[in-house]
């Protein structure tokens, strides 16, 4: 029998969360961000549940090809673009869309033979300072692309650095201003994509032609002051395991690596088959919430590679075989992330391949 840790993926929740996005964006087209194996939820499983979207965004060419070969006909965008001439050929062959964010990519594309109708998302750096051309370069790059290929589709794209933070609204306005100045100088109407998950929720004026929801599709909040549940979302991943042993600590007994937890009274401890090699955060401290048989308790001691330990005080019926919920249904992943001083994105995307995923809920 295999280890009892499981990640249950609720595909109905995915569709519910997509409906929430649609209510926010009205007429904008939706490009579901399914990078990092759909944030740890399984690329094809998620894409099939979200097959009503207008497009998908991925990172690797291999993931884009996997989607296309699985029969998805929607737009499929490579968020970091291409890295070689050979990849441009594959993009053409599989009818993929690509970001262009730097002069090196532009030079590779312009040196490539003209085939088909290229679909380019031109990334503009409006203030995140990660990827993209400077706004003052935008029209020059647009003109070079149009001179290279008269039958080319171009969408302008940018990414917000601080849309999740209400105290940084001025920074969002500055980025919008940079984008608007580029638009004032160009000729004709070009589609735009600006809004990530946080902007979808907080800045309706950024929705434009395409929105790019990521974390909200998986039921977690992009906003630091709210959980997904508070936003009307449903958790898609519920990570569970089982207690595999029970230990009895006496007063002053120490627990686990480093002996950092010291019992201040006699207590029962559940040893759970889940550790940092499964994707649970090693730095989660004592006090991080967990559920045992649906009842709230706490992580105690240091998380090890394959196991962690939980406080069974007051849960007298718990023992070997009892169900432990690490996050998901009944325990928001944002709460666990906050305790571990990280973000829900990291916890979901870090799920280990050794954890079996099941398209259901426990």
Curated annotation (Swiss-Prot):
EC code: 5.1.1.1
Catalytic activity, as annotated: L-alanine = D-alanine
Active site: 35 (proton acceptor), 257 (proton acceptor)
Transmembrane segments: none
Residues bearing PTM N6-(pyridoxal phosphate)lysine: 35
HAMAP family: Ala_racemase
PANTHER family registered for this protein in UniProt: ALANINE RACEMASE (PTHR30511), ALANINE RACEMASE, CATABOLIC-RELATED (PTHR30511:SF0)
Name of this protein: Alanine racemase
Organism: Nitrosomonas europaea (strain ATCC 19718 / CIP 103999 / KCTC 2705 / NBRC 14298)
